Amino acid sequence: MNYNTTRKGVIGQEIVKLYLLTLNARVFEPVCDDFGIDLLVETKNGYETIQVKYHNCKQTKSVSSIQIFVDNTKADWIATPFNIDGQTKIIWFKNDLNKKKWGKSFSITKPMNNQTKNINFYWDYLKSPVE
Protein backbone atom coordinates (compact mmCIF):
# COMPACT_ATOMS: atom_id res chain seq x y z
CA MET A 1 0.00 0.00 0.00
CA ASN A 2 1.36 3.43 -0.90
CA TYR A 3 1.10 6.20 1.68
CA ASN A 4 1.73 9.88 1.15
CA THR A 5 4.59 11.55 3.01
CA THR A 6 2.42 13.10 5.71
CA ARG A 7 0.66 9.82 6.48
CA LYS A 8 3.98 7.94 6.70
CA GLY A 9 5.35 10.64 9.00
CA VAL A 10 2.41 10.40 11.40
CA ILE A 11 2.55 6.59 11.44
CA GLY A 12 6.32 6.66 12.06
CA GLN A 13 6.02 9.16 14.91
CA GLU A 14 3.33 7.11 16.61
CA ILE A 15 5.47 3.95 16.35
CA VAL A 16 8.45 5.72 17.92
CA LYS A 17 6.33 7.35 20.66
CA LEU A 18 4.73 4.03 21.57
CA TYR A 19 8.13 2.33 21.75
CA LEU A 20 9.60 5.05 23.97
CA LEU A 21 6.54 4.97 26.23
CA THR A 22 6.95 1.20 26.69
CA LEU A 23 10.41 2.04 28.09
CA ASN A 24 8.72 4.42 30.59
CA ALA A 25 10.37 7.39 28.90
CA ARG A 26 8.94 10.88 29.16
CA VAL A 27 8.10 11.89 25.60
CA PHE A 28 7.07 15.33 24.40
CA GLU A 29 5.93 16.60 21.03
CA PRO A 30 6.63 20.14 19.80
CA VAL A 31 3.65 22.25 18.79
CA CYS A 32 5.29 22.77 15.41
CA ASP A 33 8.04 20.64 13.86
CA ASP A 34 9.41 23.28 11.48
CA PHE A 35 13.01 22.58 12.48
CA GLY A 36 12.91 18.86 11.80
CA ILE A 37 12.36 17.95 15.44
CA ASP A 38 9.45 15.57 15.83
CA LEU A 39 9.88 14.44 19.43
CA LEU A 40 11.68 15.38 22.62
CA VAL A 41 12.60 12.66 25.10
CA GLU A 42 13.95 13.01 28.62
CA THR A 43 17.20 11.10 29.22
CA LYS A 44 19.59 10.73 32.15
CA ASN A 45 21.57 13.71 30.86
CA GLY A 46 18.67 16.05 30.07
CA TYR A 47 16.69 16.04 26.84
CA GLU A 48 17.39 14.64 23.39
CA THR A 49 15.58 15.72 20.23
CA ILE A 50 14.45 13.17 17.65
CA GLN A 51 13.56 13.35 13.99
CA VAL A 52 11.50 10.41 12.73
CA LYS A 53 12.07 9.04 9.23
CA TYR A 54 9.53 6.30 8.48
CA HIS A 55 10.71 3.71 5.97
CA ASN A 56 8.42 1.37 4.08
CA CYS A 57 10.96 -1.47 3.75
CA LYS A 58 10.31 -3.81 0.86
CA GLN A 59 12.83 -6.62 1.09
CA THR A 60 13.47 -8.42 -2.19
CA LYS A 61 16.32 -10.45 -3.64
CA SER A 62 17.81 -7.32 -5.18
CA VAL A 63 17.11 -4.91 -2.29
CA SER A 64 19.06 -5.67 0.85
CA SER A 65 19.40 -2.27 2.50
CA ILE A 66 17.50 0.77 3.71
CA GLN A 67 18.60 4.21 2.58
CA ILE A 68 17.79 7.14 4.84
CA PHE A 69 18.17 10.72 3.68
CA VAL A 70 18.28 13.52 6.23
CA ASP A 71 17.70 17.19 5.42
CA ASN A 72 19.02 20.04 7.51
CA THR A 73 17.85 19.28 11.04
CA LYS A 74 18.96 20.21 14.53
CA ALA A 75 17.70 16.90 15.93
CA ASP A 76 20.13 14.95 18.12
CA TRP A 77 18.85 11.56 16.93
CA ILE A 78 17.25 10.09 13.83
CA ALA A 79 14.72 7.30 14.45
CA THR A 80 13.64 5.15 11.51
CA PRO A 81 10.85 2.64 12.13
CA PHE A 82 10.44 -0.08 9.52
CA ASN A 83 8.92 -3.54 9.20
CA ILE A 84 11.02 -6.61 8.51
CA ASP A 85 9.86 -10.22 8.61
CA GLY A 86 6.54 -9.12 10.14
CA GLN A 87 8.20 -7.26 13.02
CA THR A 88 8.51 -3.53 13.55
CA LYS A 89 12.04 -2.36 14.32
CA ILE A 90 13.46 1.12 14.88
CA ILE A 91 16.91 2.15 13.71
CA TRP A 92 18.40 4.81 16.01
CA PHE A 93 21.46 6.80 15.10
CA LYS A 94 23.08 9.97 16.38
CA ASN A 95 22.82 12.96 14.06
CA ASP A 96 26.47 14.01 14.06
CA LEU A 97 26.07 15.93 10.80
CA ASN A 98 23.28 18.24 11.90
CA LYS A 99 22.49 21.23 9.72
CA LYS A 100 23.65 19.39 6.58
CA LYS A 101 21.94 17.14 4.03
CA TRP A 102 23.25 13.60 4.13
CA GLY A 103 22.29 9.96 3.70
CA LYS A 104 23.12 6.64 5.28
CA SER A 105 22.49 3.03 4.28
CA PHE A 106 21.70 0.14 6.62
CA SER A 107 21.99 -3.44 5.49
CA ILE A 108 18.99 -5.62 6.33
CA THR A 109 20.68 -8.87 5.28
CA LYS A 110 24.20 -10.25 5.36
CA PRO A 111 25.97 -9.79 2.04
CA MET A 112 26.34 -12.88 -0.12
CA ASN A 113 30.13 -12.43 -0.03
CA ASN A 114 30.02 -12.32 3.82
CA GLN A 115 31.64 -8.88 3.89
CA THR A 116 31.12 -7.19 7.25
CA LYS A 117 33.73 -4.43 7.27
CA ASN A 118 32.38 -0.88 6.78
CA ILE A 119 28.76 -2.07 6.62
CA ASN A 120 26.04 -0.60 8.84
CA PHE A 121 23.86 -3.56 9.82
CA TYR A 122 20.47 -2.42 11.10
CA TRP A 123 20.66 -4.71 14.15
CA ASP A 124 23.64 -2.71 15.44
CA TYR A 125 21.44 0.41 15.64
CA LEU A 126 18.42 -0.77 17.64
CA LYS A 127 19.30 0.94 20.95
CA SER A 128 17.37 4.14 21.65
CA PRO A 129 18.86 7.16 23.48
CA VAL A 130 16.97 6.19 26.65
CA GLU A 131 18.29 2.63 26.87
Specify the residue positions occupied by each region the protein language model found.
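Mixed-charge (Asp/Glu-Lys/Arg
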Residues: M1-F35, L40-E131
